[in-house]
Amino acid sequence: MQYSIEINKNTEIFDIDKVAKQAAGAVLMRQGKSIVLATVAREEKQVEEDFLPLTVQYIEKAYAAGKIPGGYVKRETKPSDAETLTARIIDRSLRPLFPKGYAYPTQIVVMVLSADPKVDLQVMSLNAASVALYLSDIPMKAPVCGVRIGKIDGNFILNPNNEELQNSTLDLYVAGVKDELLMIEMRALPDQKENEIFIEAPYADVLTQTTSQNMNELSEDEILEALNLAQKAILNGSNAYEEAFSKHKKNSQIELKNEIEHPEILAFIENNFQKQIKEAINQMAKSERASELNKIAKEILNLEITKDWSEESVLNTLAKVKRKLIREQILNEGKRADGRSLNEVRPISIETNILPNAHGSCLFTRGQTQALVVATLGGENDAQMIDLLTEKNPISERFMVNYNFPGFSVGEASPIKAPGRRELGHGNLAKRALYPSVDENYPYIIRLVSEILESNGSSSMATVCGGSLALKAAGVPSLKLVAGVAMGLIFEDNKHAVLTDIMGLEDHDGDMDFKVAGSKDGVTALQMDIKLGGIDQETLKQALYQAKEGRIHILNIMEEAAKEIIVNEEVLPKLELFSVDPSKIVDIIGQAGKTIKEIIEKFGVSIDLDREKGEVKIAGSQNEQIKAAKDYIINITSSQKGTKKGSKDKDISGFELGQEFQGIVKKIAPFGAFVELKNGVDGLLHSSKSKHLNLSENQSLKVKISEIKNGKISVDLCE
C-alpha cells in the first residue's frame, strides 16, 4: 500500500506491507530520487537489566549513488563516521519515546538504497525510521518528525535541500513529536562568499590573502525564532504521519516490566540512613561519593533485620533515595550537591603550551573535568579525505577534532579501544563549535586532539574551551575565542530548575543535557537531548539565556589566559605560498614526478601544487630550506619554455569592462568555471558567484566582464 504525503515543502511517498514483511515494522520511503528502507525488529524475550536495549544502524549502500566501494574489499564494511553520526541522531530522537518498562532488545536499521544529491538523507532517514517504529507493535504515542532549518540572506528556510544548505549560514536539525522538542543539533556556518585570494602580479612571489569571513553566530532570540518555525513544522509532520498510518499500526501485546517497589526497604533507608546519604552527596568528590554509597549499602545488608533483602533491591532503592534527595535539594533549596548555586560555574584553571614539542596545547580544568587539547598543523597531504555518498570525488577535511575518553578519566580500569559513537559525537560537536572561528583561508591543515584526563560532566564543552585556546597557542589566527557550557534541567510536579555547568551526578539524575557553545556575540553550536519526552519553549529560553551568562563568564577567564600565551615559533611548521604560470606546473613535476621528488628529497620539504591556478605551497621545518626550494622552483619555471605544445597567449586587446557575451562553459574547476567569450578567449566565473547554479560543460551563460588584470579576464553573471 502506498501513501503520498505533501509535508513541510517535501513530497514523501511511503510503501508499507511491500518489503521486509517479517520485521516488526518496515517502510520504503521515497523523496525525489532518494529511496530508504527503514525496518524495526525486536526479540521476544526481555532483558533482566534496567536499561533500554535499543540499537540503531544507518547504512549507505554504495550502489545508491552508482559507486563501487573503494579499497581492497569491494563491499560495505564498518560504518563511516558520517553514518555513525546519523545513526546517533536517529537514536537520540527516538529513544525518549520508548515507554518506561520496555526491555525487549530492539534494532532499527535504515538503509539508503538510492541517493539523490539534492535530498537531505538525515531528515529523510529519521522520518522513515519514525514511521516504521510507529507501524510496529511497540507502543508509541505518536510518530516523531525531524526537520532542518537553514538561514539564507537573513531569512529562515524550512527543510533546505543540499544545494540551498551550501548558501546557508545556519544548520539547525530538530526532532520532536507533536508540540514537544526531543532533540536539537545546531551549528553556525561561516559566510565564505567574500573570501578570495588575489594574485597581485603575474605569477607573483606571494599570494595576498584577504578575508571578510563572518562567523554568523546566532543570538538566543534568533535560535528561539528558528526553533519556533521548526516546532510548527514538527507538529504538522507528526500529525500527518499519525493521520496516514494510525489505522495500519499493529496492535501492541507487549508486556512492560513493572517497576518493583520495596516500600519496607525504602522506609528503612529513609528513616535510618538519609543523613549519611545526604552527607555522601554533598561533601564528597565523585569517586569518594560512589565509594561511600557502596559502604552504606554494605552496612545495610550486614544488619540482622535486612538478612532477607537482596543486594540488588537494596542498591536500586538506595539509588532512588539518592536521586530524590539530589532533586529535592535543587528544587526546594536552590542548592546543588557540590554547594554551588543553580547558575554557578565550577572553578576553572588554564595552562597553555605545556607540551614543548607540540605545536599548541592547553590543559583546561573545570571542577573535576579536565581536558588536554593539542593542536597540530600540517600540509595539504595531511588532510582527511572523506568519501561521501552524494559526492563524485572524496572531499578534503582541513579541520579535524578527535576526542578520546580513556577509562582512567572516570577511575575505571578499561582497555583503550577505537573511538565509539560517544567519542565521535563529542568530537563532532566540538568541531562544529570551533569551525566558524577558524579562517577559511588559513593555509595549514589543523588537527585538534582532546585527551580527557578527568571527567565529571561537560567534557565535550571542556574540549571546546581547551580547543579554542590550543588554536591560539599554535598561532592559528582564529576570529574569536569560543567557549562551551553544559546545561541541565530538573523537573518535578510543575516545578523546574535550570542548572549551569552540570556535573556527572546532575547529568545522570537530571532530565536534560543541553550543551551550548559560542563566542561573546552568539552561539556557534548547540546540542540538546531530553529525557522527559519533550520541553517547552519557555524553559528552553531560560536555559539559553542562563547558558549565555555562563559562557561569557568562561570567556572572560579564557581571554585573560590568552593574553599570557607565548607561541613556540621554533616548533611550528613554515609555509611559503606563491604562484607560477600554470603551464609551468608540469615542469615542476617532471617526467613521472622525477623533478618534484628530487626537490622534496634535496630540501626536506613537502610541496603541494594546484595545476589550475598555478599555486605552489612549500612546507617545512626550516625557513632556509623552504626559501632554497622556492628559488630552485622559480629557476626551473623561468628557464623552461613550457611543455604544453601549441599553447600561446590569446589577444585580449578588444575586450573592455562591462562588455556582455553569451558565452559557453568550456571547463569547470574547483574555484570556478571558464566561459568562452569569443575567438577562443575565456573569462573566469568565480565559484562564489555561481554557487546557486548547477553548471555543466557546454552550457550557455550570459556574462559580463568585471575585471581585466594581468592578461586575465574575470566575469560576472548578467542579472
From Swiss-Prot:
Cofactor(s) for this UniProt protein: Mg(2+)
Keyword match Cytoplasm: yes
Leader peptide range in chain numbering: none
One GO BP annotation of this record: mRNA catabolic process
Catalytic activity: RNA(n+1) + phosphate = RNA(n) + a ribonucleoside 5'-diphosphate
Stretches of the chain forming a coiled coil according to its record: none
GO cellular component, one term: cytosol
Domain S1 motif: start-end pairs: 658-719
KH domain sequence ranges: 573-633
Residues bound to Mg(2+): D507, D513
Keywords: Cytoplasm, Magnesium, Metal-binding, Nucleotidyltransferase, RNA-binding, Transferase
NCBIfam families according to UniProt: PRK11824.1 (NF008805)
Protein name: Polyribonucleotide nucleotidyltransferase
Protein species of origin: Campylobacter jejuni subsp. jejuni serotype O:23/36 (strain 81-176)
Protein's gene: pnp
